[in-house]
Amino acid sequence: MPLYFAEHKHTADTCPTKQPEMMQMLGQHVSQENASKFGIQIHSDVVLPGQHHLMMVLAAPTQEPVDKFMQPFSMVGTVEVTEVRTCDQVVASGRC
């Protein structure tokens, strides 16, 4: 299944931690149980502390469900989704 790098950034002013209900909703949203409803497997999710920056590695059949899964984050900032490959995949294919 293809891998996707999903990146979300927001400002200190729009940070979801300022809105407990938004924080709870997004916290529940970024669960494997919920991601499975979109046909997505979460490989990794990390936040850069104090930088208002979330990054996720997700597996999905196509980019469309990833875009839909990341939609709620666009309420408070930007979202970018890019198809990626593992180093092993690049080595095996001989192409970057």
Residue positions per predicted region:
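A common structural junction motif
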Residues: 73-81
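Short S/T/G/P-rich N-terminal loop/turn motif that feeds into the first structured element of a domain
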Residues: 1-36, 41-52, 61-64, 87-96
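Short amphipathic alpha-helices in soluble, non-transmembrane regions
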Residues: 66-74
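Short acidic-hydrophobic, aromatic-tinged amphipathic segments that line or gate anion-handling sites
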Residues: 82, 86
